[in-house]
Curated annotation (Swiss-Prot):
Recorded GO MF terms: heme binding; iron ion binding; lyase activity; steroid 17-alpha-monooxygenase activity
Keywords: Endoplasmic reticulum, Heme, Iron, Lipid metabolism, Lyase, Membrane, Metal-binding, Microsome, Monooxygenase, Oxidoreductase, Steroidogenesis
Protein name: Steroid 17-alpha-hydroxylase/17,20 lyase
Subcellular location: Endoplasmic reticulum membrane; Microsome membrane
Main location (coarse class): endoplasmic reticulum
Control of this protein's activity: Both 17alpha-hydroxylation and 17,20 lyase activities are significantly stimulated by the presence of cytochrome b5.
Provenance organism: Mus musculus
Family in the record: Belongs to the cytochrome P450 family.
Gene that this sequence comes from: Cyp17a1
Listed cofactors: heme
GO CC, one annotated term: endoplasmic reticulum
Function statement: A cytochrome P450 monooxygenase involved in corticoid and androgen biosynthesis. Catalyzes 17-alpha hydroxylation of C21 steroids, which is common for both pathways. A second oxidative step, required only for androgen synthesis, involves an acyl-carbon cleavage. The 17-alpha hydroxy intermediates, as part of adrenal glucocorticoids biosynthesis pathway, are precursors of cortisol.
Record: residues binding heme: 441
Catalyzed reaction equations: a C21-steroid + reduced [NADPH--hemoprotein reductase] + O2 = a 17alpha-hydroxy-C21-steroid + oxidized [NADPH--hemoprotein reductase] + H2O + H(+); progesterone + reduced [NADPH--hemoprotein reductase] + O2 = 17alpha-hydroxyprogesterone + oxidized [NADPH--hemoprotein reductase] + H2O + H(+); pregnenolone + reduced [NADPH--hemoprotein reductase] + O2 = 17alpha-hydroxypregnenolone + oxidized [NADPH--hemoprotein reductase] + H2O + H(+); 17alpha-hydroxyprogesterone + reduced [NADPH--hemoprotein reductase] + O2 = androst-4-ene-3,17-dione + acetate + oxidized [NADPH--hemoprotein reductase] + H2O + 2 H(+)
Listed EC numbers: 1.14.14.19, 1.14.14.32
Length: 507
């Protein structure tokens, strides 16, 4: 009997293990696996997935494979191999696996974040970049960020001497920036629509952060599934909210004055319908559904990520007040209190920029990048990678590699400064906070400006210290789609030098 069982397992393994068209091809070393269930029984049950994958490198090396059900996934944990996937062979690995949960979120592969590699994806991505170019004219983007950062500071000013959790205020400020970019609309802090946007954004991130077997075994979707129902509910609320803003944009649309991502997408749709592009573009890729999913992707990619990093920066500064004081010393010296810090001040506020870079290293926005998919039979290093193989870049491994980083688990902003402290450096190529290549973060330039300007304004005006209850922020984090930090409070104190400067201005 056991001989028959063994034979059956071997037969199943033969049919389910990927085949290569290249004779004698060498595959990445694999975790053990069983037919149908794959390597699931052999994966660690506890701990964060990115850390577990990193730990497995000790046994299997910087690139290895595993089976998720009947799907092959390759885990990449070294910068040279990661850059090969993302940049050198970026087009070959620019595909996206189609999963049940992501299919619900992207209306079956529309948009830019979760869409598979296609001409439609490339076109929408190009138009999103065009939007950011639009806002770079006359420093519109920087002025908008400064306006929201100033509004945030005005709200925090009312909490002088108190211990508060600032995450909601920060979240709403970032929402307003994204709403302006997407729809040329902004809201007052108490407007209920901001709470609605925060609720569905956090809800989607939370649900996607729970691994669901339905993405490994799609046939399970025929059974009741709480996570799928929650995704449907949050997506429904998101669509209703975005449609309301979208309709307002259509009413105000003026082809002579494009002012938002939605305007650019509407104009592209009109050009395609009138065949004004000269490229024979299919107007159907600009349906309202396509436009709304692309805008929804920008909401998802641009809100939770930036607000989360701002919270992480505050938390690390509370843990490391000497770093905070160094940043404030630079601000006092090079900016003072008579003007608002600008993005150009990066050349002088080196410790602030180094701190931002270090936070993006030690707590990457996404410890595991969204999975890629091989569009063709390809290779990574010396290993053959068959078409349709899923490829997961373990950014955590790159950013915590002891061979590349000195004391990688220690918060050390100075690692991004030269020995004299007078120039910013990147000490190793093993640093990819925004990914790279065709699937790199679309909003990298926006995020860098937001992080710098928000933190420069906040630290110009306030001290943030351990809360009155003496509870330091927990730095373990909760890695969902975005690496979140647990809620925490900080003691807020308006800086005396800032107060004195305001008195001088008013007299």
């Amino acid at each position: 009997m056991w001989e028959l069982v063994g034979l059956l397992l071997l037969i199943l393994a033969y049919f389910f293990w990927p085949k290569s068209k290249t004779p004698n091809a060498k595959f990445p070393r694999s975790l053990p696996f069983l037919p149908l269930v794959g390597s699931l029984p052999f994966l660690p049950r506890r701990g964060h997935m990115h850390a577990n994958f990193f730990k497995l490198q000790e046994k299997y090396g910087p690139i290895y494979s595993l089976r998720l059900g009947t799907t092959t996934a390759v885990i990449v944990g070294h910068y040279q191999l990661a850059r090969e996937v993302l940049v050198k062979k970026g087009k070959e690995f620019s595909g996206r696996p189609q999963m049940v949960t992501l299919g619900l979120l992207s209306d079956q592969g529309k948009g830019v974040a979760f869409a598979d590699s296609s001409s439609s994806w490339q076109l929408h991505r190009k138009l999103v970049f065009s939007t950011f170019s639009l806002f770079r004219d006359d420093q519109k983007l920087e002025k908008m960020i400064c306006q929201e950062a100033n509004s945030l500071c005005d709200l925090i000013l009312t909490y002088d001497g108190e211990s508060r959790d600032l995450s909601t205020l920060i979240f709403k400020s970032v929402i307003n920036i994204i709403c302006t970019i997407c729809f040329n609309i902004s809201f007052e802090n108490k407007d209920p629509i901001l709470t609605t946007i925060q609720t569905f954004t956090e809800g989607i991130v939370d649900v996607l952060g729970h691994s669901d077997l339905v993405d490994i075994f799609p046939w399970l979707k025929i059974f009741p599934n709480k996570n799928l129902e929650m995704i449907k509910e949050h997506t429904k609320i998101r669509e209703k909210t975005l449609v309301e803003m979208f309709e307002k944009c259509k009413e105000k649309f003026n082809s002579e004055s494009l002012s938002s991502l939605t305007d650019i997408l509407i104009q592209a749709k009109m050009n395609a319908e009138n065949n004004n592009t000269g490229e024979g573009q299919d107007p159907s890729v600009f349906s309202d559904k396509h436009i709304l999913v692309t805008v929804g992707d920008i909401f998802g990619a641009g809100i939770e990520t930036t607000s989360s990093v701002l919270n992480w920066i505050l938390a690390f500064l509370v843990h490391n007040p000497e770093v905070k004081r160094k940043i404030q010393k630079e601000i006092d010296q090079y900016v003072g209190f008579s003007r608002t810090p600008s993005f150009n001040d990066r050349t002088h506020l080196l410790m602030l920029e180094a701190t931002i870079r270090e936070v993006l290293r030690i707590r990457p926005v996404a410890p595991l990048l969204i999975p890629h998919k091989a569009n063709i039979d390809s290779s990574i290093g010396e290993f053959a990678i068959p078409k349709d193989t899923h490829v997961i870049i373990n950014l955590w491994a790159l950013h915590h590699d002891k061979n590349e980083w000195d004391q990688p688990d220690r918060f050390m902003p100075e690692r991004f400064l030269d020995p004299t402290g007078s120039h910013l450096i990147t000490p190793t190529p093993s640093y990819l906070p925004f990914g790279a290549g065709p699937r790199s973060c679309i909003g990298e330039a926006l995020a860098r400006q937001e992080l710098f300007i928000f933190m420069a304004l906040l630290l110009q005006r306030f001290d943030f210290d351990v809360s009155d209850d003496k509870q330091l922020p927990c730095l373990v984090g909760d890695p969902k789609v975005v690496f979140l930090i647990d809620p925490f409070k900080v003691k807020i104190t308006v800086r005396q030098a800032w107060k004195d400067a305001q008195v001088e201005v008013s007299t």
